[in-house]
Amino acid sequence: MDQEEEEIEIPNYFICPISLEIMKDPVTTVSGITYDRQNIVKWLEKVPSCPVTKQPLPLDSDLTPNHMLRRLIQHWCVENETRGVVRISTPRVPPGKLNVVEEIKNLKKFGQEALGREETLQKLEVLAMDGNNRRLMCECGVHKSLILFVVKCTSEDEDGRRRIKGLDESLRLLHLIGIPSNDAKTILMENDRVMESLTWVLHQEDFLSKAYTIVLLRNLTEYTSSHIVERLNPEIFKGIIGFLKDVVNSVNRTSPTVRETVQSSSRPSLGKTEPSKLDHSLVIKQAVTAALMILLETSSWSRNRSLLVDLGAVSELIELEISYTGEKRITELMLGVLSRLCCCANGRAEILAHRGGIAVVTKRLLRVSPAADDRAISILTTVSKFSPENMVVEEMVNVGTVEKLCSVLGMDCGLNLKEKAKEILKDHFDEWKKFPCIDITLLTKLLSISPKGPKI
């Protein structure tokens, strides 16, 4: 056999478990597995866990360069150069703390020309593409400087104008590096203009910037004082609901501008490219989840529930669920918010008024998760107990709720779920009998049996 035809045997420990190719810049994660740096960074941006061990790995977790393995790979490449193997180059040393601090100083020089600020933001974003740099940037306070920069961008000057050059890039960079929980606790309490700035962004046209803003808002409200969360400005709720409406329109192909934003990450870019490699569709999905989490948390208070119902949240949540079929987490959150909005009469009325309200809740029952089941049955219980009987009964018959509740009684599921299903069927039994499509014999039999929990 000729030397050229001889198959080259590559040592297994030279291969990246993700790409199955020779590693160019091997780094070891805290889980003990070594990957090529570029591959593991991309992986962690979408899935925060070790591909091999499944151990949780935050995006900012340490990636330790494996210099010895890299030298072994380089030595092996040199030895096999005559067989067509190209030597991997030594990766550049990531910029250190001094570089980051210098860029922060540039960022703070708000009075400089816009081009200077843009270059600073681009340099910071390039730094943030390296997983090791993100923690360093947080230690240096990049996130704090960026938030102040966003506030300045959205604040009116003496002429009543806003200098928004660099605003979109700042929001994207904040999304990339995140905000440490310790700082998130105090940012809103120390500067009330932050909330004003984020509210302003939510009412602008740029769809992606609104997505970044909602994720940022969730990060800030998650750890801050409950008093701030309880008294959020109605304009914030209006902006969040408007964002969800835009998402629904993009899925339903009625908003071309938004749809292009969602799809742009999958198309090759021409000309000047942005340094960020964030997947736009993933960012929007994260923003939808963040928006629902904000609504779920804030709807604990009656004042906020009334505001959300008046702003049309019930209808938009139902439309979102219809459009986002198959997204488990989004379904669970949506049902959670709806179950809280059902605590007020107007919320229950809105669910009944929407043609798909009871139908979509019924359809998700027993199809998603135990958490979704609990929230769906809670909605049906509240609506059936406190809404006009004639409206509830007819709607539940028409959309198959009665049959689904009978299925709950006959399935191996939670005892609490069965008891609530039985309660609904029992409360309206006399009305169900009037409908020829209802199997009264089966219904009577099911109601006579004591509910039992799942078999162990």
Curated annotation (Swiss-Prot):
Q: Which residues form the signal peptide?
A: none
Q: Which domain of life is it from?
A: Eukaryota
Impact noted for substituting residue 43 to A: Loss of autoubiquitination
**Annotated Pfam families:** U-box
Q: Where does the U-box domain lie?
A: 9-83
Question: Quick one: a GO biological-process term for this protein?
Answer: defense response
So where does this one cross the membrane?
none
Its Enzyme Commission number(s) read 2.3.2.27
The entry's keywords: Plant defense, Repeat, Transferase, Ubl conjugation, Ubl conjugation pathway
Q: Which PROSITE patterns match?
A: U_BOX (PS51698)
**Could you tell me one molecular function GO term of this UniProt entry?**
ubiquitin-protein transferase activity
How is this chain modified after translation? Auto-ubiquitinated.
According to its UniProt record, which reaction does this protein catalyse? S-ubiquitinyl-[E2 ubiquitin-conjugating enzyme]-L-cysteine + [acceptor protein]-L-lysine = [E2 ubiquitin-conjugating enzyme]-L-cysteine + N(6)-ubiquitinyl-[acceptor protein]-L-lysine
Expression is induced as follows: By the bacterial elicitor flg22, and bacterial and oomycete pathogens.
- Pathway the protein contributes to: Protein modification; protein ubiquitination
Q: Which PANTHER family match?
A: E3 UBIQUITIN-PROTEIN LIGASE PUB24 (PTHR22849:SF24), WDSAM1 PROTEIN (PTHR22849)
Task: Provide the function of this protein.
Answer: E3 ubiquitin-protein ligase that acts as a negative regulator of the immunity triggered by the pathogen-associated molecular patterns (PAMPs), in association with PUB22 and PUB23.
Q: What is this protein called?
A: E3 ubiquitin-protein ligase PUB24
Source organism per entry reads Arabidopsis thaliana (Mouse-ear cress)
